[in-house]
Every structure is written in structure tokens, then in C-alpha cells.
Amino acid sequence: MSQQLLVITGVSGHVGFRVLVEALSRGYKVRAVIRNASQSEQIKATDSVKPYLAQVEFTVVPDLLVPGAFHGILDGADGVVHVASPLPSGSDNFKRDLIDPAVNVTVNILKAAKEVSTIKRVIITSSIASLLTWDYIISSDSTKVFTVRDTYTPTNLEGPFANAMDAYGVSKAAAFAATERFIEEEKPSFEVINILPSMVIGKNELNRKPEEVGKGTNGIILGVLLNNKSETPTLGVSVHVNDVARAHIDALNPVIQGNHNYLCSSGGVEGTTWDDAKDIVRQHLPKAVADGIFPLEGRQPSRPIRLDSSETEEAFGWKFASFGEQVKSVAEHYLELSVAK
């Protein structure tokens, strides 16, 4: 294992950072792709990465969309873990700034990998957005059980879109479809595995201040524990970030079926009820509740979604961490930073 080299993109993000830590802790050497040099200092300063500095090198690629951006970056690698993907921003040109980049970066790295004979597997971070159309999300149906085989190919990439999250879902589904098309048409020598997480929850070690803990999907948990009263339902499915990272690195193992896809979500088909976070924190962090650090005045309606990820648990041989573990991970990190402030 110590002789194997991985190239990992997106290491400055919530999932990508944990994938980096998981890979290093298992003895992989890692070539981590970042967009600016300052990101490497922040990553190297974390307690989880410090013990493994001799195993990691950072490579700056300012624009992953440039043709040939990965030229030379993948040389000598045994595997690639592609996590980087654009997130919704303030732009309303969703095709230009969200959908096209998601597709083009993925195809860019697949083309580069095809030129490197040593690469055996490419692992790509997809999303349950590759399963769920916006029309389904806003429907009243909560009976359909989705498996990893229920992906769809979006036919409308131009819009209009209902909102940024509608466009984000299309971007992930389009990137997934482009990956499948690449495998079919190019027939690369390496195998490709897509990992499809639901709402990713768990400590993000790159957040160093309490006000940063609420960034991204962890903000759903923190909003409930503090005082954010949302009226808009959020998909009631979640997964621990550590499990998502574990799945990415496990997927490199040749005993795991290649050219296959794996759904990552906890709680079985019943999924997650976001407001349960209050009872979890009352039970596990009663002093923080009594001290007013967690007023528990928030509210987050859950949109029931039924996902069956049992095939992933069977393939990898472990169970997804509970919603309780996810909540504790976020709450304890917020508490730690609040006390240290």
C-alpha cells in the first residue's frame, strides 16, 4: 500500500479533505490538487494531516477546466479520486458556471487518466442528485425507493431552472451521465466507480472558528441546534463525512466491483429527520444545552426520501454511522471551538 500513489482533487473541501486524511492514514502517497498555494498551508496545519506530511505533495492547478490541465499531474499514479466539483454561487448563469464546469472537469480528468497506463481505478464523487429530479423532489411522492440503479440523464441543460439547487442537481446528473458515456465510448483500461452520497454531515477540520462550522450541509444541523427556523423542507437523508471518505478509499480495492456505483446514506429507507438533532444533543451534551450554547430553538422540516444503500454496506462490509453520530460530530466540534474562542 505504501508504494501506491493517489491523485486527489478537491482536498480543500469538506469531503475531499476527509478523503485525503483517509488515504494518508492507510499508507497511500498522495498528490493533492489545489487551486492556490495558500490552501496547502491550511491543510498541512491540521492535526489529522501533520503526522503524514512526508506522504503528501501539493500540486497547484489554478483552473481545472483548461484543456490539458491535468497533463503530467497524473503521471505515475495508481489511482485517482476526483472530488472537486463546482457548488452553487451567486451566478444565475447556471449552465456556464455550474453545469458545464461539472461535466468538463470530470471529462478532463478522465481523458488525462486514459493517457497514464499505471492508473487502475478512478473514483468520482457523484451525488444522490444523480437519482432525484427536481420534479420528484417537489412532488408529494415519498413511496418510491431509490437504489444506485435509478440514475437519470438530464435532457435540459439550458434551463430555465427553478433555482440554484435545481441546476446543481442537473450538474451532478450530467457529470454522471458524461462519465458513463466516456466509459462506453472510450473503453479505458482503468475502472471507474462513482460514489453517490446523500447530505454529508460531520466535522470539517478545516473550519477553525465556531461561525465557520455552519458552512455547507453542516449548517442544517447547526441551524436546528441554534435558532434557524426554516420553512423550506430539506431532503431527509444524510451520511457521515467519514463514511463517505472511507467508501472512496475502499473503492480502490480490487475486491470491490469496478465500473459500478455505490450509494452512501444512513438510516436505511427511513432516512433522517433533521429536528431529531435536538434530542440527540439534549442526551449527549446536556451541559452545553443548559449553558445556552445550544438553545435548540431552530427548526428544519424534512422532505422524506427513501434510499436503499444496503448494497454498499454489503460490498464494503461495514454499516453507515447513525444520524446521532453525525450530529455529535458537528455539535462537539462547534462546542470545542466555542469554548476555545
Regions found by a protein language model. Give the residues of each.
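Active-site Tyr-X1-5-Lys
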Residues: P154-V192
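A conserved pocket-lining segment of Rossmann-fold NAD(P)-dependent short-chain dehydrogenase/reductase
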Residues: L157-N163, N207-V239
